[in-house]
Amino acid sequence: MVQEAQHHPIDAVITWVDGLDPAHLKKRKSVMGSAPNLFHENAINPHRWACNGELYFCLASLEHNAPWLRKIWIVVDAQSPDLSGLSAALRAKIQLVDHTEIFANYGAILPTFNSLAIETFLWNIPGLSDQFIYFNDDVFLTSPCQPSDFYTMNGSILRGTWADFSSLEDDPVQMADPVKFNHYMQINAAALCGVSSQRLFRTAHVAHPCLRPTMAQLHSRFAAAFRANAGYRMRDIRQFSPQSLHNHACILNKTATVNSVKDHFHIYSGQGVGAVDGTIAALLQNIDETPDIKMLCINDLPQLEALYPDIRGWLAQAVTGAPRSSSTE
């Protein structure tokens, strides 16, 4: 029986970047140099640094569906997102934290353009709560949530599936496939914990409830691996997923519960492209009509907008809880 959590302060952490900012673009080009072929295709896709307004929807979803959050930390690289359209109450919860702060004592690693490197030290944010929920800015809450949707007295509530990735190991064709890149990040994380690729926990594209003390303990245990992971300025096939490492450690330590209800949906990049008209509308209507859905990830909002021009209107209604069935009819 899952025990309800005694609710401690819970923060949210969101990573954000504006890749078209001239200063950021200049730094990125200096790292990539004239030989982008040295990096994995997954690492240099410009979509990784695109800013398409997702942050606003993510923040609005937290205000409407998780008002109990204590603070919302936005991790930035000498940038400031426009928060002027948000309510005063929501802005009061938000605090920007720069890469220089989370990489304290590791300054030589900067600048970095690698989300995996950044995620490696999110737990190092000064003043962060022991329980924190990590969001990519393309993840949104679409229904009211409670702390008990993320934590129990035993620890974190994880979302994902058990998977066998053993066929991917040492396969150069698969290793070069940008779609499979995330699989290798999870293989590497599981291996660090001594978990076989034949049965590892494949973390879903969701909001990730994290335990800061667990990440600190993992850092103490695997200090060299953490530093190496953070040292890649661009994504690299040798890296591990910090979320996956955290989740496998929690499973092994019995400080995690795997959610038995699929309460999330992932619209991946390329989904619906080339499909018959009405495919995306039907998909969105299915999300509308599924009461269990509490989280939504949209990997490529501009691509989805080209297929369904009213997606921003639909998403605005989805994250605020307004009736939205008519928007997909």
Model-derived features with residue positions:
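A solvent-exposed, charged loop/short amphipathic helix patch at secondary-structure junctions
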Residues: P9, G19-R48, G160
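Short catalytic/ligand-binding loop motif for oxyanion handling, primarily in non-cytosolic enzymes
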Residues: L20-H24, S80-G85, A104-N105, F140-P144, ...
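Active-site-proximal specificity loops/subdomain of glycosyltransferases
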Residues: P46, A50, S80-L128
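Short, acidic, metal-binding catalytic loop of nucleotide-sugar glycosyltransferases
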Residues: S61-L69
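Short beta-strand/loop segment that forms part of the nucleotide-sugar
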Residues: R70-Q79
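GT-A fold catalytic core of metal-dependent nucleotide-sugar glycosyltransferases
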Residues: S80-P81, F121-F165
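Long, charge-rich alpha-helical interaction segments
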Residues: I157-R233, I237
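Long, low-complexity C-terminal extensions of enzymes
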Residues: I237, L245-E329
